[in-house]
A protein has these predicted regions:
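Conserved N-proximal alpha/beta basic substrate-recognition cap immediately N-terminal to
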Residues: 5-104
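A short beta-strand motif that forms the metal-chelation/ATP-contact edge
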Residues: 50-54, 114, 163-165, 230-245
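Short glycine-rich anion-binding loops that position phosphate/pyrophosphate groups of nucleotides
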Residues: 58-60, 117-118, 240
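Anionic group-transfer/hydrolysis microenvironments
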Residues: 116, 155-156, 164, 223-225, ...
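Catalytic core of tubulin tyrosine ligase-like
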Residues: 142, 151-157, 166-187
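A long amphipathic alpha-helix within ATP-dependent nucleotide-binding catalytic cores
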Residues: 183-234, 242, 254-269
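A short acidic/glycine-rich loop-to-helix N-cap element
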Residues: 245-252
């Protein structure tokens, strides 16, 4: 069995490029897999030689290449269709249809303006707006950049929890990034240090699994906010997880919960 790992273009991993690579290395290592960047011109030819492809790719060109590989019988995880469904505006509709709790549009503590057509590539793609004038300015900036697909969500107080999992395997982990001050853009600071409010891990896992199923994205990660009463909302969801912790660190786990040298792709697709 030949296993290939496809890395995201670096612009899709702002401030986490090395951790992204570490995850992919750990995933393909049991099968001595080869890693290639999604923008590499040799990608189409290489994909035709694979049995299984673990892909973090997000560019339209790479996803089209992966579509063709799937058509030829290659198992691709995550499937390109699942990656397309991870656009924020699409996920919002899927979450609402799957009874997955997400933030309301209106609140009392400000707003988040988020680019809806793709994952954040810079700090300017996800903006905290403490008041209405700030929101209006952020919207004007989006329009000046040609961004007309966006989400507006109310800012909610509570603990930020990062989670990651793999459908159909029972593998699900979460942690509090505020415990270590780990952050991609520093946005977690708006929620302060975590209080570790009690909540149902089972319910969080179930909600994430419903969204992953709807998105056809078996290997996933995301963020949630836990309220003092134990309720939660999902504020972010991604194909794969961007793990802001050293692989093998004190919270280290095999990044996608795969046992060394064994894989059952039928359970993931």
């Amino acid at each position: 069995m030949r296993v290939i790992g496809v890395r995201r273009a670096l612009r899709f991993s702002p401030n986490n490029e090395e951790k992204d690579l570490a995850i992919m290395r750990a995933v393909v290592a049991p099968w001595n897999g080869e890693i290639i960047l999604e923008e590499d011109p040799s990608l189409p030819e290489l994909l035709t030689t694979a049995t299984v492809v673990f892909s973090m790719a997000r560019t339209s060109w790479a996803l089209s290449c992966l579509d063709e590989a799937e058509r030829l019988g290659v198992c691709v995880l995550n499937p390109p269709e699942g990656v397309r469904r991870c656009a924020r505006s699409v996920l919002q509709r899927l979450a609402e249809a799957s009874s997955v709790p997400v933030p309301p549009r209106e609140g009392t503590a400000g707003w988040w303006l988020k680019r809806g057509d793709t994952a954040a590539q810079s700090r300017a793609d996800v903006v905290f707006c403490p008041d209405r004038p700030a929101l209006d300015r952020a919207l004007a900036d989006f329009r000046s950049r040609g961004i007309d697909d966006y989400l507006i969500q109310a800012h909610l107080p509570g603990d930020i929890v990062k989670f990651y999992g793999v459908l159909s395997t029972g593998f699900f982990r979460f942690f509090y990034p505020g415990d270590d001050g780990q952050s991609k853009f520093g946005d977690e600071s708006h929620n302060g240090r975590p209080h570790h409010y009690a909540f149902s891990q089972y319910d969080l896992h179930a909600a994430a699994s419903r969204l992953a199923t709807a998105a056809r994205c078996p290997i996933y990660g995301g963020d949630a906010i836990i309220s003092p009463d134990g309720s939660f909302v999902l504020i972010d969801f991604n194909d794969w997880q961007l793990l802001p912790l050293p692989i093998g660190g004190r919270r280290g786990h095999t990044p996608v919960g795969l046992e060394r040298g064994r894989i059952n792709t039928q359970r993931l697709i």
